[in-house]
Amino acid sequence: MAVALLDDWCKGMDLDPKKAVLIVGIPVQYTEAAINDALKEGLPPLCAYKVIGRMFRREDEAKAVLIELPEVVDYTMMPTHIPAEGGAWEVVVKPRSPDDEFMNKLIYFLRDEGRRIVDVAKALGFSTVPTGKIELKNLDQDKPKGLKSLCNNSTCYKKLKVFSGSPFPGPGEESFETWLEEVTELMQLWQVSEREKKQCLLESLRGSALSIMQALWTSNDSLTVEQCLKALKHIFGNKEDSKVLQFRFLQSSQKPAEKVSDYLLRLEPLLQKAVQQSPLSAHSADSIRLKHVLSQVSMTTGLRGKLSLLDQQGCPPTFLELMKLTRDEEEWESTVVVEEQEQVRRDSSACEAANEVVTQAEDSREVSTQTTGEEMTSVKRRRLLWRHSAGEEGQRKESGFWAESEPDEQKPYVRAQESGNERGAWAVSHPNPKEIEAQDSQEFLPVAGNRDTLTKSWGSPDKGTGDMSVAEGQQGQGKAPNFLLARNDPNKQEQIPHSSVTTKWQDRGECQRLKWGASMITRPQGNPDRSWDTSGSQDGEDGCSELRMPTGTEAAQGVEEPATGLSWAEDTSAWEQARLGRETVPRRGGRRIQPVFRIIYTALGEPHEGSTLESFRE
C-alpha cells in the first residue's frame, strides 16, 4: 500500500518515483519543525532533500511525508527506518528493477568504449532500419534520463584524460606527450562529427591549455581538431633541436640478446622524431632506416643478404615491410633451432643406448671372465689333486706295496723314463740319436745267463735288487746279477727296484734270449714262427742284441691272451721273473723307432709333453 501511495503521489506531483522517498508512521502530534529535525538526524548527511508535502493516513492513524531527492535513490546509503520518539518511522522507496541496473551498466560500458546505441543495433542485425526509426521499448518516465539522452542524442564517447598545460602535472593530470598520444589515437577512431570532437577536446583541457584553445577558436572558427593539436604541440611540445634528435637516432644500438624486430620497434620513434624536425621525405626515412639497420644490427646471413640486395637496388622497404621480413626470418631461425635441439636429443638418446649396450657387454664379459677364472681354478685344482694322487701312487710303487699285494697280471706297468722326456724338455736342444740309442742299449740291456741261473738267483718277483756294482760282482762270480733300471740323468742316478718294473711280452709265437757277450741264442721249442727280429744292434755294445716286439695283428692278439703254442710251460714262471728286469725297444720292420717329442697345448692350462712311444707301450 505504501509503494502504491508513492507512485500515485509522484504522478500527481510530476515527480520521478526513483528520486522520491515516502516516510510513513509519523505521530500526529509532530509539528513540521520536529519532523525536519528528525529527518536531518535520520537521513545520510550528504543527502540533499526537499519536503514536497504532508498528509494524514486513516489506515495508520499517522502522518506521511513525501521527500524529493536531486539524484536517484542510492539503495546502499538509504536507511529503512528513522529513529524518533514514540517509535521508528518507515522509509518507503521505489523497488529496484533488474532492467534498470542492466541499462545503467550498458550506458557506462558504451561510454567507455566510445560506442553508441546505434552501433549496438547494427551489431544485432538492425542495420537496414533507419536510425531515426529505432525505438526502444518502454521508453516512458520510469527509464533513466541518461538513457533517454543517449537514445535521442547519438553522441557517446570515452572521457579523455586531462591536460592543464602546467610543466608539473597535478593529481589526475597527464603530461603533454601522454595526453597528445591518447587524444590523437581516439580522434582517429571516433566516428562522430567535427563539432563533437571539438567539444570532447575542450572538456579534456584545463588552465592555460583551455584558454589558448578558446582563443584559437574565437579567432578562427573553421579550425579542425588536427590543426588545434598541431598548435598545442608547437606551444607545449618538446623544444629539442633536430640535431639532438638525429644524434639520438644515430647513437641507438642493439642490446645484447635483443631480437631485430624488437630493436626496430624501439628505433622507429627516434627516427620519426628526427624526420619531423628535418625536411626529409618518407623515402629518405626508409633509406636511412635500412642503412642504419645494416650497419648497427647483428642478424643472420640470409636476412643480411636480402637487405643488402634491396639497398643495392635502391628499393628500401617501408617499416611494415621490414618488420614482416624480419619476423619471417626469426620464425625460420627458431624452427631450425628447434630441429637442431631435437636432433641433439635423438643423438644423445642413441649414445645412451650405445653406452647401455657397452655396459651390458662389459658386465657379461666380467661374468664370463669370472666363470673362466673359476674353471681355470677347478682345472688347476683337479690337476693338483691328480698330481698328488699320482705322487702317492708312485711312492707306493717304489715301496713295492703294489708289487707285493697284486698278482703279476694286475700289476701296473712302469717304464723307465728316457733322457729329456720330462717337463721342460721342449726347451732343450735334441741330442744325437746315436747317443740316445747307445744309452738305451746300456739302460735296458737284459741280464746275462740262462733260465736256470736266473731262476735260482731271483727266486721270486718280490726280491729286491742291489746297486750296479753288486750286479757286476755277481756276474763275475757266475751268478745272475739283479737287473737295475737306471734313469738317465747326468746329475743323479736313480735306481728303481725290479719289483716295481713290469714288462709285457708277446706270448704268441717264440721268445729268444741272448747271453751277455757270447751272443748265445736260446729258442724255445714250438712253432718256428719268425715274428721276432734276431738281428743284433749295431749301435749298442758288442755282443748285445735287441728284442723286437710284434706289431699289428700279432700285438693286438697277444696283449691279454696267453700263448697257446708255448713249449716250455714248466719254465714260464722263471721266465716271467727274468722279464721283470728287461725293457723292450719297439721296432717296426728293421728300423728302430726313435721317440718323437711333441708339446700338447691344453686350453686354459700348461703345456704337456707326449711321446709316440705311448701308443706302443699301451
From Swiss-Prot:
Region Disordered: start-end pairs: 390-409, 451-475, 519-549
Protein name as annotated: Paraneoplastic antigen-like protein 5
Subcellular location: Nucleus
Tissue: Restricted to testis, where expression is low. Not detected in the brain.
Lineage start: Eukaryota, Metazoa, Chordata, Craniata, Vertebrata
Basic and acidic residues composition-biased segments: 390-399
Any one biological process term the GO annotation gives: meiosis I
Recorded family membership: Belongs to the PNMA family.
GO cellular component, as recorded: cell cortex; meiotic spindle; nucleus
Organism: Mus musculus
